[in-house]
Swiss-Prot record:
Full protein name: Glycogen synthase
Gene Ontology molecular function terms on file: alpha-1,4-glucan glucosyltransferase (ADP-glucose donor) activity; alpha-1,4-glucan glucosyltransferase (UDP-glucose donor) activity
Function of the protein: Synthesizes alpha-1,4-glucan chains using ADP-glucose.
Origin: domain of life: Bacteria
Pfam family, one: Glyco_transf_5
Family of this protein: Belongs to the glycosyltransferase 1 family. Bacterial/plant glycogen synthase subfamily.
HAMAP family xrefs: Glycogen_synth
Catalytic activity: [(1->4)-alpha-D-glucosyl](n) + ADP-alpha-D-glucose = [(1->4)-alpha-D-glucosyl](n+1) + ADP + H(+)
Keywords: Glycogen biosynthesis, Glycosyltransferase, Transferase
Amino acid sequence: MHSILFATSEAYPLIKTGGLADVAASLPRALLKLGHDVRILLPAYESLLAKAASQGLKTLGEISLDDINLTLHQTRLPGTRVTVWLVDIPEFSARAGNPYCGADGNDWYDNHLRFYWFARAAEAIALNQAGLNWQPDIVHCNDWQTGLIPALLSLHPERPATLFTIHNLAYRGLFSYQAFGELNLPPAFWHHERLEFYGQMSFMKGGLAFADFITTVSPSYAQEIQLPEHGYGLDGLIRYRQESLSGILNGIDTDEWNPGKDKHLAATYNRRTLGNKTKNKLALQETLGLALNADVPLLGFIGRLVDQKGIDLILNQLPLLLEQDCQLVVLGSGFPHYEQRLREVARQYPDRVSVTIGYDEGLAHQIEAGCDIFLMPSIFEPCGLNQMYSLRYGTLPVVHAVGGLKDTVQERPLDNPGEDANGFVFHSPDALDLHAAILRALDAYRQPATWKQLQINAMNRDSSWEQSAKAYEAIYANLCS
């Protein structure tokens, strides 16, 4: 059994902007079930404090660092036994809105200071200098917001082991040399083998350079980020550290995403009652104002309407797709020009295309259950969660062969799908390649026996966090040996 400080900038349902929040909710819970002592460390954002208050919030005391005092609160991750510690400074708790940026979409001007103090709090806890009478064996850090923690702990000979997980290398936590000067960091950290990155400071690089071990969220992504085209200038450092790098697929919350018990659905179902899936399709069509037709293929997309998610590929092949007898459902928000183009298509084809701008958790579940085919043409995808939700719901994904999509979705010839074929894969980020994969999916849909076999294969896949947690457990054991 190990004691683990799990440092993260978000954790569902307390605060969420992306997939990191889902991981930070599920992995600690899975580790707790394996017998480990896990404490989550989060910034005390204003909105988070309001949610935590309903769970019960206890102030543990203050941590004095240099010329400021940080307040430490304690709560629990809702619905679990996982302890959560909250680092409270006014730059977190007295600022409404997004954790990282203002309403105008620009990063908060003082993010370097905000997450520096968060790292200093983690350092104090890790060294048992926070008055908690608790010290972890391992500090598990996540993405750039925690990248300074391994760097700071490297200054102490007697310290816990450090693990740094890359969830998305595209966000490198870049700040100016002037910002570096505002932090009480050793001048030696301004070096190309440490935090300096082409004249800037990179918090992400701090995690990569100083952590004892590095993981990322899928085996394929671990390989891709060692290449210049996917490394964002950090590929050389990652190649240098490849012996201390492992890719571990994320799991999904199989209680929250369970078609057999999902409260959001018109009808629950499992592998033996797949016929009930049609009831969800008809309910979704009715809810969204589409033509009611159990036989027409219904395609879905859920995600940010940004270039990374391949929404332009969907839009560019849409005229060809609409020549087919099918329907399309889109849920998401993002770049205004993508939102506008999608709205125009929905107005033009009101009984065939539905577009909901924003995010609705219930509707997301209904799309996963009601659709036949799920589109995930991401240009890059470190792990991806929606393809695993789709597999669990027997909704066959069409994916671009990158990152975690490549590791979870397999395509085989329809005349011999075997037991591992569970979707459709295209290999270049091109609208025509995506369209060809969709046509293969539509062809399979017209073969009911084959389609059902693919659905059963998909639903048989184990996407639970238990497998992922055991892989992390093995790394923890090696770090502590």
